[in-house]
Amino acid sequence: MFMFEKPHGMRDTLPGLYETKKKVRRSLTDLIDKWGYQFMETPTLEFYDTVGVQSAIEEQQLFKLLDQDGKTLVLRPDMTGPIARVAASKLLKHGHPLRVGYAANVFRAQEREGGRPAEFEQVGVELIGDGTTSADAEVIALVVGALKNAGLASFKIAIGHAGIADALFVEVLGNVERADVLRRFLYEKNYVGYREHVKSLPLSSIDKSRLLELLELRGGIEVCGRAEEIVDSAQGKSVVDELKALWDILEDYGCTENVRLDLNMVSHMSYYTGILFEVYAENVGFVIGSGGRYNKLLGHFDSPAPATGFGLRIDRLIEALHMKDEPCEIDAVIFSKEQRAQAIAYANEERMKGNKVVLQDLSGIENIDQMTKSFANVTYFIGARKEEQNG
């Protein structure tokens, strides 16, 4: 019946899954908090002309609506734009790098046949006002630490750079615009299409080989040496030097086992201007998080500042962890009128110990056997006696 249907892409979170999400969220936010990031919240609704326009999310994925004054609003499609707005208007006045954390739901319209959620929770950080490679390394190292703290044992962070493909394309094709088709193939990870398109271009065999070699630039620090062989410009060499410096810092953090370079990475997040990355878990075929440097975004809010950050998807992380819904850890105290005072006192004592306790009047239960199956332990205060039943 229609009354039980939900809008396309919207999902209910039942108690068991809610507890699982809470546990995973806390494991991430606890570590982020220890790294000195301060958490904040922003409105669910933002103006389209500010946050909506500057969002990296594609236009057709924005949820739009009108307010009473006829202004177009959007449900926030990500948290980077809203935090950039707040930083530009209120926080950057402090004059030092900002470290901001968040745990929030974001909204992206989905195709009906896609089966993807249109609302999902992200936990992440933004480091604003620090343009150094140390800042890039910090957020990547924080991702590694947060995922380990959540219990994820096997994962890789693929690190790329927005400038490496652009530098090569400019050298070979003359400008970035002529490379739009190649960039689309890389974004879609359609490497067969990329190869076929390169072969069709009116280029020398040497230049075609350079474009094709881009697909092979994956691995450890040795990838930087191979990248230097296919880029000649100062811009390209500078990107390689930046990646080398990043790797050195990640070695100091002790997290290079969880990272690899992927220099043909292209993100749909068009505002990325430098180092960018995606997080993959073993046996999971989708990205569970991503991030990177976006030095131009704050300028759109009249407060130019370098920035980097990341966002992790709670739902995908739960799937990567192969977590089942959290088992019930709630106890019940069932009482009759004769022992109501004793039952209330007992329940309060247990709650003071940190236990979760439901206090239930016997007269309000239709099927006591069915109800007690929902609790870990049940204590009865009925008539003149007290009885305990362990789940």
Swiss-Prot record:
Xref: Gene3D superfamilies: 3.40.50.12590, Bira Bifunctional Protein, Domain 2
Organism: Bacillus subtilis (strain 168)
Protein family membership: Belongs to the class-II aminoacyl-tRNA synthetase family. HisZ subfamily.
Localization per record: Cytoplasm
Note: This function is generally fulfilled by the C-terminal part of HisG, which is missing in some bacteria such as this one.
InterPro entries registered for this protein in UniProt: aa-tRNA-synth_II (IPR006195), aa-tRNA-synth_II/BPL/LPL (IPR045864), HisRS-like_core (IPR041715), HisRS/HisZ (IPR004516), HisZ (IPR004517), HisZ-C (IPR053846)
Protein name: ATP phosphoribosyltransferase regulatory subunit
Primary location recorded for the protein, binned into one broad class: cytoplasm
Keywords: Amino-acid biosynthesis, Cytoplasm, Histidine biosynthesis
GO molecular function, one term: catalytic activity, acting on a protein
Alphabetical list of NCBIfam families matching this protein: hisZ_biosyn_reg, PRK12292.2-4
Subunit structure: Heteromultimer composed of HisG and HisZ subunits.
Role played: Required for the first step of histidine biosynthesis. May allow the feedback regulation of ATP phosphoribosyltransferase activity by histidine.
Pathway info: Amino-acid biosynthesis; L-histidine biosynthesis; L-histidine from 5-phospho-alpha-D-ribose 1-diphosphate: step 1/9
A GO biological-process term: L-histidine biosynthetic process
Entry annotated with the keyword Signal: no
Family matches, as SUPFAM superfamilies: Class II aaRS and biotin synthetases
Organism superkingdom: Bacteria
Gene, per the UniProt record: hisZ
Assigned GO CC terms: cytoplasm
One Pfam family it belongs to: tRNA-synt_His
